[in-house]
Amino acid sequence: GEEVGLTLQKRFRYIREAFSNDELTQIYKLDETKLPRYPLGWEPWLQTALDTIQYQTETEELIFYVGEKAYKEELEARGFEVHLEERRFGISATMIRENPSKYWKYIAQPFRRQFTKKVLIMGSASNGKTTLAKDLARFYDAPVSLEYAREYQIKNNVRDDELTPKDYYYLLLGQYDQTSKLIDSSANRGLVIADTNSLVTKGYYDYYMEVEGQDTSMTDTFDNLFVSILSKEKWDLILFVQPIGSYVNDGFRDMTMADEEIRTSFSNYLDQLR
């Protein structure tokens, strides 16, 4: 798991999540960092495992269920009852890691977020990003996370140039939450496309809040939130769309952005941020 970014802590949390509704199953974490690598170290590994589950030899019965014959032999040699559970689907963890999309239906739901390919389409407004995102999503039969800011502005009836620092906090959190939920949804079959991300929100914040001369404490709060969210966003591919075509007035856009010089300058700033 480590080779694909699945640390011990992630694996532990994801498995706990998978069994969250199972009251009869308990999940433990066994750190093998200081133990000899397999096939060595059976004795210290076994003792660590027994200590971890707080096994009481005099009052409890312990049965191991394993997927490898070698494991069964080693544990039986040490006096434990062992059941060998052979693979029923002809797949392995290695096969999934090498080609997750092929074996997508066999990947437990919490682990799918780790193997999802995430494509970001970013750029300034009114340049065809949304159309491109929808077309790609339709072609690849993938879910798409559209611009949360537009939904937010329609709901609150607020234009680009009327947004406050507090609004931008909500935009950062809302966009990240929307995309994260899509990645974790049943609609995700291994590919998710996003129309925008925190970098674009940061670009607009810098553009409008600098003009309005907001105090530094608000900017510091926003920047801390931005850095935190940006560190969690992992993209496999970023498509940067240049500002080509007419700037459409949809009732919420700031039409000063229709000026070619301003539009190009803002697009260049976004390019620098990424």
Task: Give the predicted meaning of each segment.
Residues 128:
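Conserved glycine(s) of the Walker
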Residues 132, 136:
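Hydrophobic positions on the alpha1 helix immediately C-terminal to the Walker A/P-loop
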Residues 1-117:
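Nucleotidyltransferase catalytic core that binds NTPs
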Residues 138-180:
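Conserved substrate/cofactor phosphate-moiety recognition/catalytic segment
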Residues 169-233:
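Glycine-rich phosphate-binding loop used to anchor ATP phosphates in small-molecule kinases
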